Curated annotation (Swiss-Prot):
Name of the protein in question: Ribosomal RNA small subunit methyltransferase A
The entry's keywords: Cytoplasm, Methyltransferase, RNA-binding, rRNA processing, S-adenosyl-L-methionine, Transferase
Keyword Repeat attached: no
UniProt-listed Pfam families: RrnaAD (PF00398)
UniProt source species: Rhodopseudomonas palustris (strain BisB5)
Gene that encodes it: rsmA
Length: 287
């Protein structure tokens, strides 16, 4: 990409700005420019699109997004050491890169969007990847402020996001993710593509928000999934007791045999049980 955008190779950028990756920040820098370009392309056409990127580091993916045609990139970076490298990219793409020095866990990018929708594209820091995703999935109101997420995770986490019922990786994260989004595993990235090399393979996942997910109280859905998968080897008639209602009633509302286990229940079944739980609680409140 240095031949395309005229910027120096990433290894030179890292050395010049003393950007040794820090484990405490969950940093693993992706230096393969073919892969950063592939991630950018996975987000679809970027012309006239604002992209929110988390943890850009030395800016490999940032450069790919801009070179691919993103009208504007909002790069949220906590590590002040990376700001100089990002400012060089901003100078190369005048008016198209906005750098925000902030912790993504505490920062709301929506005021910067001015009512526009965006796409989220990021090689997420491993140590905050799942909490960030859950926060985005819990956005209210829905549909959210983003049209798409293309995100990199440790492969084990990626599998938990895209899993379906009867998959070993199916659990609470899959229920929440697939209730609100269409999820797809796109491709894997070997440890050798990163500096430093992580011990595990990474995977890129695309999540496209559903315009109209099945109506459901999100808090109730999270509670039902937590109870069911908290004792995933037990039957629903046992695992759902912690909710303080009759598990058989929840299962019946979903047309599910209460002797089944959580891992066999589709997202629609969890939605039905959550709605029944919410109805029961609302009835108790009114009496």
């Amino acid at each position: 990409m240095s031949a395309i955008d005229g910027l120096p190779p990433l290894r030179d950028v890292i050395r010049r700005h003393d950007l040794a990756a820090r484990k405490s920040l969950g940093q693993n820098f992706l230096l393969d420019l073919n892969l950063t370009a592939r991630i950018a392309r996975a987000a679809g056409p970027l012309d006239d699109v604002t992209v929110v990127e988390i943890g850009p580091g030395p800016g490999g993916l940032t450069r790919a997004l801009l070179a691919t045609g993103a009208r504007r990139v909002i790069a949220i970076e906590r590590d002040e050491r990376a700001l100089g490298a990002l400012e060089e990219i901003a100078a190369h793409y005048p008016g198209r890169l906005e750098i925000v020095c902030a912790d993504a866990m505490d920062f709301d990018p929506t005021p910067l969007l001015g009512g526009e929708r965006a796409k989220i594209v990021a090689n997420l820091p491993y140590n905050i990847a799942t909490p960030l995703l859950i926060g985005w999935l819990c956005t209210e109101p829905w549909p959210p402020w983003y049209d798409m997420m293309v995100l990199m995770f440790q492969r084990e986490v990626a599998q938990r996001i895209v899993a379906r019922e009867d998959d070993d990786a199916y659990g609470r994260l899959a229920v929440l993710s697939n209730w609100r989004c269409e999820t797809n595993m796109l491709f894997d990235i070997a440890p050798s593509a990163f500096v430093p090399q992580p011990k595990v393979t990474s995977s890129v996942v695309r999540l496209a928000p559903r315009a109209a997910p099945e109506p459901c109280n999100r808090a109730a859905l999270e509670q039902v999934a937590a109870a069911a998968f908290g004792q995933r080897r037990k039957m629903l008639r046992q695992s759902l007791k912690s909710l303080g209602v009759d598990p058989a009633r929840l299962a019946a509302a979903a047309g599910i045999d209460p002797t089944r286990r959580a891992e066999t229940v589709a997202v629609s079944g969890f939605v039905a049980m959550a709605n029944e739980l919410n109805n029961i609680r609302n009835t108790k409140t009114q009496t």
